[in-house]
Curated annotation (Swiss-Prot):
The keyword Amino-acid biosynthesis applies. It comes from Brucella suis (strain ATCC 23445 / NCTC 10510). Its EC number is 1.2.1.41. PROSITE patterns: PROA. It catalyses: L-glutamate 5-semialdehyde + phosphate + NADP(+) = L-glutamyl 5-phosphate + NADPH + H(+). Catalyzes the NADPH-dependent reduction of L-glutamate 5-phosphate into L-glutamate 5-semialdehyde and phosphate. The product spontaneously undergoes cyclization to form 1-pyrroline-5-carboxylate. One of its GO terms (biological process) is L-proline biosynthetic process. Pathway: Amino-acid biosynthesis; L-proline biosynthesis; L-glutamate 5-semialdehyde from L-glutamate: step 2/2. Belongs to the gamma-glutamyl phosphate reductase family. Keywords: Amino-acid biosynthesis, Cytoplasm, NADP, Oxidoreductase, Proline biosynthesis. This is Gamma-glutamyl phosphate reductase. GO terms for molecular function: glutamate-5-semialdehyde dehydrogenase activity; NADP binding. It is found in: Cytoplasm. The lineage of its organism: Bacteria, Pseudomonadati, Pseudomonadota, Alphaproteobacteria, Hyphomicrobiales.
Length: 423
């Protein structure tokens, strides 16, 4: 629930109060039944739709401020809500409600020779802190995912999306969710983020940052609690010599241009040198016709003069815009070398028909999501059947890839005996 902050208190006191309330809410949430949680989630979806007009009006205020501040088109796209996106938010919440309840799931069980029966069982993490920037939908997605997994959540959205996030949160309040299950940080001062990163006196169990490189870097540098890091999406698409050209053209256009401002958008296109003379121009022509700026290596410029020269910086840049860097590589080995050198380990895709080539791509590239003959824009929790996601974790500890309800749980061991002692 929204905290009514007494601004005579300092920020540390305000945030400590938020933490105490979240910790108190986490205990009953951890033992809530599936029926109780699903009923609350469906009520939240209804409330979002009923508050549609208020949410859109709040979003217009945020968009006006973004235009006034000269924000990039990709930023504005992430910030924008419309009828279809609000419908998608509500549908995402309902999808989360239909997912199996992870809490209490027996992940593994076995018997010991001494007769002990051991079970590894999923449990909630406790209190999740989510720090995000310009995506107001995260308010609903994160709240719903955490609730489904039996966690309380503290949301700290960016000032750019403050009106939209507050309107969505107000709608969630109207759904009579468990008290303090979903709180939004009541102050805009960045010092509040610092307090969250300290853990709010042990209240926060994990932090999930969702935003730009500077935000994630700050969280990783300052956090005193575990972090599910969502780094930038420097995503690659590799077109192998065995690729079907028509398929490659469709996938390349979608991977880059469907939505340029999301983390799963392709930022670098790699083409097998063996088919550059036949495949490069058609693929780049499609991208250019769609409004994409092409930045190519010297070899690419020779075959496609309309491209602009790529710099070394381009290979490690997340554009979040209608720009793509393009290079030729010596087959799958060259693609693997380039990707492992420049990737942020988010998402990579290959278009190929040769099974051995695909196997090497899957085995030798260490990124959270690898796709074969499919667009990088499928790197999304909703597309994975998770209902929604808090982010794409690019680290290797605990959560990796889309962070959904299962990733928002831990586990404990239940050991059943019949009087055994070690002696």
């Amino acid at each position: 629930m929204l905290v009514k902050a007494d601004m005579t208190k300092d920020i540390a006191q305000v945030m400590a109060e938020v933490g105490r309330k979240a910790k108190a809410a986490a205990a009953p949430l951890s033992i809530a039944t599936s029926e109780q949680k699903n009923k609350a989630l469906n009520a939240a979806a209804d409330a979002i739709l009923e508050a549609r007009a208020d949410i859109l009006e709040a979003n217009r205020l945020d968009l006006a401020n973004a235009e006034k501040n000269g924000m990039a088109a990709s930023f504005v796209d992430r910030l924008t809500l419309n009828e279809a996106r609000i419908d998608a938010i509500a549908e995402g919440i309902r999808a989360i409600a239909t997912l199996p309840d992870p809490v209490g799931e027996v992940i593994a069980e076995w018997d010991r020779p001494n007769g002990l029966h051991i079970e590894r069982v999923r449990t909630p993490l406790g209190v999740i802190g989510v720090i995000y920037e310009s995506r107001p939908n995260v308010t609903a997605d994160a709240g719903a995912l955490c609730l489904k997994a039996g966690n309380a959540v503290i949301l700290r959205g960016g000032s750019d999306s403050a009106h939209s996030s507050a309107a969505i949160h107000k709608a969630l309040e109207a759904a009579n969710l468990p008290a303090d299950a979903i709180q939004i940080v009541p102050v805009t001062d960045r010092a509040a983020v610092g307090e969250m990163l300290k853990g709010l006196g042990g209240a926060i169990d994990v932090i999930v940052p969702r935003g730009g490189k500077s935000l994630v870097a700050r969280v990783q540098s300052e956090a005193r609690v575990p972090v599910f890091a969502h780094l930038e999406g420097i995503c690659h698409l590799y077109i192998d010599k065995s690729a079907d050209l028509d398929m490659a053209r469709r996938i390349a256009l979608d991977a880059k241009m469907r939505r340029t401002g999301i983390c799963g958008a392709a930022e670098t296109l790699l083409v097998d040198r063996a088919v550059a003379s036949t495949h490069l121009a058609p693929i780049l022509g499609d991208l250019a016709a769609g409004g994409c700026e092409i930045r190519g290596s010297a070899e690419v410029l020779a075959l496609y003069p309309a491209a602009k020269p790529a710099t070394e910086e381009d290979w490690s840049t997340e554009y979040l815009d209608a720009i793509i860097s393009v290079a030729l590589v010596d087959g799958i080995s060259g693609a693997i070398d380039h990707i492992n050198r420049y990737s942020s380990h988010h998402t990579e895709a290959i278009v190929a028909e040769d099974a051995q080539t695909v196997a090497r791509f899957f085995n030798e590239i260490d990124s959270a999501i690898l796709l074969h003959n499919a667009s990088t824009q499928f790197a999304d929790g909703g597309e994975f059947g998770m209902g929604a996601e808090i982010g794409i974790a690019t680290g290797k500890m605990h959560a990796r890839g889309p962070v959904g309800v299962e990733q928002l749980t831990s586990f404990k061991y239940r050991v059943r005996g019949s009087g055994q002692v070690r002696g």
